[in-house]
């Protein structure tokens, strides 16, 4: 094997030793006294929401006391699991002053609106990725959380994985020199979908579907709209995997370096827009400049972020591992990080943030940075134009009317930001 082709496995990166899982992660640790617990309400407990719900159940200093979901079976199942209350209306959870934090694991178009209601109700939040439906939502989220002084944790669990931590530490510590190029790959989005109207299932009901749509346009129910993966690929409700999965490798990019803050950001490229129902961008291939750093952001069959230094050394971080251009780069790297703040228990990190008043590792500032790149990419594809962003003023530079039109979207009454 050639040295330059060497694949640094986790063992060579210092993470090959057995992983010791705390008993609390398995639900075996004795719960803390009630006075020391952070009370949690779970908003959205289907699919991914159920996974997140269970991760907070496993935290010894947390107590999940209420759940809300539009689907009757989901909220009743989860309420039975945690021994808490089941609500149709998430606002009943937010109105309870005894609840400290909430998880927001709804369809994408509800992420920021519910998070804003929660912040104004003085609840800290776990918010599933992607962040916002528009640039306006993203910026409003940061402003409202700062005003209300509550904690925000993003659903970028890769920050809790040792391989990702080590890779970002290597880049931050200068092991590959000055970063000159970054390659960001994300799984592709979907297309197709059947928009044919059909009866609303009894488990959801007319009121449930109306609440499920919320601020999104009023449209007839169809099964492909509400199925777990389908909702990610409908533009009324999402920007697709540009944000929905792109959030993960883009988050690694901003965690490892600050190129997106170093100068003007320019985004241009190509992509396809599907249909008849799934009409978000797929097959994208974006060319991005972050100051003087070149970034390729493209759809692929994997999740990966590769950092290339000025002398050719590189580090590639992906969900299940870490590669480097040379085994020497990572051979002596231990977990005593000096350039990244890390945790190995994602849900517990939010609980500790609330208990000890500290910022979660997966924080809102970085969520805004990565989500902004996703939105700039979406705007560039949809307008077939180069988009320029000023990261200091946090606004588009000399935007066209078509670009301006995509910065925000109307919300259906009575929902607002």
Question: Model segments located where?
Answer:
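Rossmann-like dinucleotide-binding domain that binds NAD(P)(H)
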Residues: 210-292
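NAD(P)-dinucleotide binding in Rossmann-like oxidoreductases
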Residues: 272, 276-280, 284-345
């Amino acid at each position: 094997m050639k040295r330059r082709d060497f694949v640094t496995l986790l063992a060579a990166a210092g993470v090959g030793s057995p992983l010791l899982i705390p008993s609390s992660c398995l639900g075996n640790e004795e719960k803390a006294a009630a006075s020391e617990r952070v009370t949690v309400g779970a908003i959205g407990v289907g699919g991914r929401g159920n996974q997140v719900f269970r991760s907070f159940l496993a935290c010894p200093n947390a107590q999940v006391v209420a759940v809300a979901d539009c689907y009757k079976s989901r909220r009743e199942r989860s309420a039975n699991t945690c021994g808490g209350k089941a609500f149709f209306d998430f606002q009943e959870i937010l109105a309870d002053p005894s609840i400290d934090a909430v998880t927001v694991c709804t369809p994408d178009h509800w992420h920021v609106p519910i998070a804003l209601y929660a912040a104004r109700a003085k609840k800290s939040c776990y918010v599933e990725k992607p962040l916002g439906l528009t640039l306006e939502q993203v910026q409003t989220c940061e402003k409202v959380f700062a005003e209300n002084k509550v904690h925000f944790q993003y659903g970028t669990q890769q920050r809790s994985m040792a391989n990702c931590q080590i890779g970002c530490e290597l880049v931050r510590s200068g092991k590959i020199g000055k970063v000159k190029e970054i390659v960001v790959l994300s799984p592709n989005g979907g297309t197709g979908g059947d928009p044919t109207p059909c009866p609303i299932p009894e488990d959801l009901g007319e009121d449930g579907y109306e609440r499920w749509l919320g601020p999104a346009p009023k449209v007839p129910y169809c099964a492909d709209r509400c199925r777990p993966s389908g909702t990610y690929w409908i533009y009324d409700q999402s920007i697709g995997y540009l944000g929905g999965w792109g959030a993960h490798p883009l988050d690694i990019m901003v965690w490892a370096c600050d190129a997106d803050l170093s100068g003007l950001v320019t985004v241009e490229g190509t992509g396809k827009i599907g249909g008849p129902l799934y009409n978000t961008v797929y097959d994208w291939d974006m060319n991005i400049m972050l100051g003087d750093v070149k970034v390729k952001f493209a759809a692929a069959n994997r999740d990966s972020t590769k950092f290339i230094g000025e002398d050719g050394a590189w580090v590639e971080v992906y969900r299940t591992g870490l590669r480097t251009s040379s085994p020497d780069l990572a051979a002596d790297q231990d977990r005593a990080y000096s350039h990244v703040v890390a945790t190995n228990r994602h849900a517990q990190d939010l609980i500790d943030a609330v208990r000890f008043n500290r910022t979660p590792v997966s924080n809102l500032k970085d969520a805004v940075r990565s989500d902004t790149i996703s939105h700039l990419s979406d705007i560039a594809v949809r307008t077939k134009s180069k988009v320029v962003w000023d990261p200091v003023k946090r606004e588009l530079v000399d935007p066209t009317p078509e670009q301006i039109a995509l910065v925000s979207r109307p919300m259906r009454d009575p929902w607002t930001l």
